[in-house]
Amino acid sequence: MRPMAMALAVQEAINNVSAYVASFDGSGAAPAMTTTVAASGTADATSTDTGGQAVTVAAATSGGSAEAGAALYTTCIACHGADGAGNQALNSPRIAGQSAWYLTNQLKGFKAGYRGSKPEDIYGMQMRPMSMTLADDQAIANIAAYITTLNGAVSPATLDGNAEAGKGLYVTCVACHGADGKGNEALKSPNLIGLQDWYVVRQLQNFKAGIRGTHPEDINGQTMRPMSMTLADDKAMKDVAAYIISLRK
């Protein structure tokens, strides 16, 4: 009976998300987003070309100071790189191009312990003490603002996923992350464009296994977990990741 109940829970979650998105205007379109000018002095997202692939660099919307964040970011360089491109050898994702609001939420999550506190989350546990070097919410806002100024190159595919098969699976993701994969702040859905395929797969595995998205304070993670359960196995996850990479073009 338990698998049946889980299947119903997953479908209900999908229906709820779809209904919420549809409530915006009847067409399913999300409301227009308002961008706040950060201390870095830029409000508009910019695009950079990396190896023939256009990647959007998110605008800073945290209200933080990118200048102050630059000094704080020195702690992050060893793993994420000076340009925020990440490092697979260190299991560090690309953070360049990510939205300030999402970076802020995740850093707060690590610091509060609802992300990176489970023994199974080895790499999350490595990140948690890093978040604790940030004294307060202002420091988090500052470093998030600085990261939005980075434009580290995206990584090529590393897995053998099938993008065509992943396209069909991605329909579940469209309501929150968008057909273009760029996310939606109103739905607390991050930008997926530019993330490495291995990182996408690992996070889907973590959500499905309950390593992520089960803490009572992780409201947004709880929304994502049933979505991960729609993917039958690791192959399906690799296929979705391959399709997400194809959205860069």
Residue ranges and their predicted role:
Residues M1, C79, A96-S99, N105, ...:
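Mature, folded catalytic cores of secreted/periplasmic enzymes
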Residues M1, T56-A59, G81, M127:
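Sequence context of c-type cytochrome heme-c attachment sites
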Residues M1-M33, Q88-R94, F110-A141, P156-D160, ...:
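Axial heme c-ligation environment in periplasmic c-type cytochrome domains
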Residues V17, V21, G69, C76-A82, ...:
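The canonical Cys-X-X-Cys-His
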Residues D25-S27, P31-Y73, Q88-N91, T148-Y170, ...:
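Electrostatic cytochrome c docking/interface patches
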Residues V57, A66-A112:
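The feature marks the first
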Residues A70-I77, G97-A100, T104, K167-V174, ...:
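Sequence context surrounding c-type heme c attachment/ligation sites in exported
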Residues H80-D83, S99, Q126, H177-D180, ...:
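Conserved functional loop/turn residues at catalytic and ligand-binding sites
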